[in-house]
A protein has these predicted regions:
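Long, contiguous binding/interaction regions
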Residues: 1-104
Length: 104
């Protein structure tokens, strides 16, 4: 059964605490720049571990030192609590890995 979609207020409240994150056509998106390519790739491995633990899997792209991340709940057709929680986790992981949110 699909998870209920988050309300606009829930999304706005979460985004207020997630620097660099934005809502875009039913997805939460962010781009992080890292000191090196190796640091960017290592960050994706931490995302993979967190996603596996949450059983919720975002998409990401590595562009040299920049990692673009997007999360949505496909079964529900938009942003759910799963995405808000995963965004919070990814945000904390990026801070720990010295990722800097940048315009995507």
């Amino acid at each position: 059964m699909p998870h209920p979609l988050a309300t606009q207020q829930q999304v706005a409240a979460a985004l207020a605490t997630l620097s660099g994150w934005r809502s875009d056509h039913g997805e939460l998106r962010v781009s992080y720049r890292f000191p090196t390519f190796d640091a960017a790739v290592a960050f994706t491995l931490t995302i993979a571990a967190a996603a596996a633990a949450a059983d919720h899997h975002p998409e990401w792209t590595v562009r040299y030192r920049v990692v673009d991340v997007a999360t949505t709940t496909h079964d529900s057709g938009g942003i759910t609590a799963l995405d808000l929680d995963l965004a919070r986790t990814i945000h904390a992981l990026a801070a720990k890995a010295r990722g800097e949110a940048v315009a995507g």
